[in-house]
Amino acid sequence: MGRMHSKGKGIASSALPYVRSPPAWCKADADSVVEQILKFSKKGMSPSQIGVTLRDSHGIPQVRFITGQKIMRILKANGLAPELPEDLYNLIKKAVSVRKHLERNRKDKDSKFRLILIESRIHRLARYYRKVGALPPTWKYESATASALVA
């Protein structure tokens, strides 16, 4: 899939292993993995940060192969899922930081243009999440209240 606001084709990506069972060297059981996920979530980590931490520090290659569920589904089942989807949250955070930069540097035309691109991505993603039901139908992105969403 190509990039939205640039010329890149986006060919490179990591490939999941063909075998969908946990590898023989992985000794973790499903209950301990779920416990660790909930512990990290209570510390304030995002789902992708939880996955990276489990992979790098605890030797758990794929949570889904061990537990049978993705990290977000585990968090939703335990009531710890974030209110905003993670990709939308990260875009809003980026838009807030660019807007803050523009307050200090009013003549930065390139950042002004990039802010327009970021906000158009936010609107597109919000439209998708409203359609799917991950966001309420009345949810709307407003730049004035965006810093409160991220804080």
Curated annotation (Swiss-Prot):
InterPro entries: Ribosomal_uS15, Ribosomal_uS15_arc_euk, Ribosomal_uS15_N, uS15_NS1_RNA-bd_sf. The keyword Ribosomal protein applies. It holds the Pfam family Ribosomal_S15. Keywords: Cytoplasm, Phosphoprotein, Ribonucleoprotein, Ribosomal protein. Its main location: cytoplasm. The modification Phosphoserine is found at S21, S32. It is found in: Cytoplasm. One of its GO terms (cellular component) is nucleolus. It comes from the Eukaryota. One of its GO terms (molecular function) is small ribosomal subunit rRNA binding. SMART domains: Ribosomal_S13_N, Ribosomal_S15. One of its GO terms (biological process) is cytoplasmic translation. Gene3D superfamilies: 4.10.860.130, S15/NS1, RNA-binding (1.10.287.10). Component of the ribosome, a large ribonucleoprotein complex responsible for the synthesis of proteins in the cell. The small ribosomal subunit (SSU) binds messenger RNAs (mRNAs) and translates the encoded message by selecting cognate aminoacyl-transfer RNA (tRNA) molecules. The large subunit (LSU) contains the ribosomal catalytic site termed the peptidyl transferase center (PTC), which catalyzes the formation of peptide bonds, thereby polymerizing the amino acids delivered by tRNAs into a polypeptide chain. Component of the small ribosomal subunit (SSU). Mature yeast ribosomes consist of a small (40S) and a large (60S) subunit. The 40S small subunit contains 1 molecule of ribosomal RNA (18S rRNA) and at least 33 different proteins. The large 60S subunit contains 3 rRNA molecules (25S, 5.8S and 5S rRNA) and at least 46 different proteins. Belongs to the universal ribosomal protein uS15 family. This is Small ribosomal subunit protein uS15.
